[in-house]
Amino acid sequence: MISGLLGIPERQISSTLHLLGEGATIPFISRYRKEATGGLNEVQIENIKEQHDKLCDIARRKETILSTINEQGKLTPELEKRINATWNPTELEDIYLPYKPKRKTRAEAARQKGLEPLAMIMMLQREPNLTAKAATFVKGDVKDTEDALKGARDIIAEQVNENECARNAIRNQFTRQAEITAKVVKGKEEEAAKYRDYFDFSESLKRCTSHRLLAIRRAESEGLLKVSISPDDEACLERLDRQFVHGNNECSHQVKEATADAYKRLLKPSIETEFAAQSKEKADDEAIRVFTENLRQLLLSPPLGQKR
C-alpha cells in the first residue's frame, strides 16, 4: 500500500521499515544504509515513516471500532469486511458513525419517547393523514402532535447526517464549490493590523494559496479573525432533497424540513471541520517545505558568502 502511494518499490520500503524498527534514525539510514534502501534520501524515508505511522494509527482505530460495534451486538460479517477493507480514515469514520456511542442527542431523546416508528412512517412518505397518525403517538412525555412530529424530524435528521452517500455528496460540494471566508473580530482591528488583507476576505478554497491559508489560520488562532468554510448551501440542500424527499405530501414536507435541519445543524458543521483540518494540514505542509528548502539553500551556501 505504501509502495502504491509513494511510487517506491516494496523491497526498498520493507528494508527501510526494518531499519527504522531497529531504532536507526532517518539521517543514519540515508547516509550509511544506502545499499539496504536502494539509495533513498531523507525526504523519501520520512515519507515512508509517516505513511507507515498513519496506517498503524488506522489499524488501531479499526480494532477499537470493531470491538465497540461487537460489544453492541451489531457486528455482521459484511460490516466487519467493509471495515477491514478500508484504509481511508474519513470513510472508516463514516462507516462507524451510526454505531458510535453518543451523548444524549435530540434524536436519542425522541427515540426514548417512542417516536422512531413515526420517523420510519414519515421516511416512507406514503401516509395519507400524517397529522392523525402523529396524534396516536401523543402519550407519556410527548405533549402534542407537533412535539411528536418534531421528535420524528430529529430522528430523521440524525439518519441523514449518518448516511454515507449524503456525507460524500456534501463533501463533493465542498471540494468543488467551497469558499473560505475571513472577517476581523470586532474591536480587534488595530491589534490585527498585519492581517489587514484578510479583514473581509473570501476566496475559493481550492484556489486559496498555502501562504494565505497559513496567515488566515494563524490570525484565527490568535483570536483576530473569524474564519468559515462554506459551499453553496442551496446546491447542497437540493442534492439532499433529491436523495431523501419523494413526492409532495405532508410526510415529504416533514422530511424536507428534517433534511434542512440535518444539513444546517449536523452535516455542514461536521464536513466544515474536516475541510478546515485539511486546509490547515496543507498550509503546514507547505510551510515545512519552504522552511526545508530555505534551510537547504543556507547549508549549501559558502560559509563566507559568494567569492568575488
Model feature map: region roles:
Residues 1-12, 63:
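C-terminal interaction appendages of subunits in large macromolecular complexes
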Residues 4-6, 38, 73:
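Helix-turn-helix-type domain boundary/helix-start signal
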Residues 8-43:
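N-terminal cofactor/phosphate-binding cores enriched in small/glycine residues
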Residues 13, 48-51:
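Acidic, Mg2+-coordinating catalytic module of metal-dependent nucleases/exonucleases
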Residues 28, 44-47, 54, 58-68, ...:
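Duplex nucleic acid-engaging cores and interfaces of nucleic-acid transaction enzymes
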